[in-house]
């Protein structure tokens, strides 16, 4: 998401010196990351505020995976303000604990984030993962109900709940099978089960 706006602090004349960008202010991330983005922008952007193009700003900022969205404000005659919304961390990559998955679908190096997140196993595919997360959120489950998510190359998912119940899902009709799994887990008659296998259409297999 990009929002571009302008502010006129005073009347200006069409002189080159007035049009020159002499201040770029970036906010929203850590001080270190704000500085990195500022320096990159200073090196790459046009020196004239009137010739500044949003696609050039986007090309630079999109290199930083921590960014979820941002707004740009031109403060005439010579200042640019960029406010950044940091992406939310939603999962950890299982084979490399130094990387997190952002809500923007990008991988971010983990510097000091220690809060609990689901582990993602299998080859990471941003689009498929975000689509699957959306399906979960549209079911009666919450994404935070799971501590491990397994993705298989043939487009099938398994999920392990925080109560150590493994749900084996089919390749299709995920929302429907998630609803079935939720009903089983909510039923006291099945309180000791450890596996819910829903891979075969119209069949439910449970194991203790």
Predicted features by range, described:
Residues 19-21, 32, 65, 75-79, ...:
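Extracytoplasmic
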Residues 81-153, 159-160, 166:
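Extracytoplasmic segments of membrane-associated envelope/inner-membrane machinery
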Residues 1-7:
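Hydrophobic membrane-insertion alpha-helices, especially the h-region
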